[in-house]
Amino acid sequence: MKEFPVLNSKVNEDCSELTYFNDHNIGIAVDSKIGLLVPNIKSCQSKNIVDVANELTRLTESAREGRVPPEDLKGGTISISNIGAIGGTIATPIINKPEVAIVALGKLQHLPRFDENGHVVSKAIMQVSWSGDHRVIDGGTIARFNNLWKSYLENPSAMMMAMS
C-alpha cells in the first residue's frame, strides 16, 4: 500500500477533496450468519505477518458468528473479498464507500496451462478482480498494484521483507 497511497484514500461526495490515510485498515468481507460484515485489521502497516494472521482469525471468527464489536467495523481504508472461501471463482466486487478500491479473490484452482516448452502442465490459478473509484484511481494504477501483489504471493519471502 505504501507504494500506491491513492488506494488507501477516500474522496468526498462531490469529488472536491481527497484524503490519504496513514493507517492501512484492511477490511475483510465475511459471509456471516447475519449477512455481509466487513471488519478491518487496523494499522496493518505496523504489524508483522503473525500479528496480521492472528487478527484475521479473530475478526473472521467473530464476524461469522455475527458478534463483531462496532469499532472493528469502522475505519476501513480498502477491502478484500475472498469469494473463494465459499467456492466462488470470479466476481466483480462492489466498493465499500468511502473506500476507493476493493479486491475479490477467487478459489485456488489447478488448471491446465502451457509451460515454456509448450507442454500442458497443472498450474495453481486464482482469479483476482478489482474495482476502483475512477474519480480517483485509473486502471494502470490498479494493474501495477496487482502485479506487485501477485509477485508477493508468488514470492512470500519478498513480501516478508517488504513488511519489515
Task: Tell where the protein language model's regions lie, with residue ranges.
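C-terminal catalytic/motor cores of large multi-domain enzyme assemblies
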Residues: 2-164
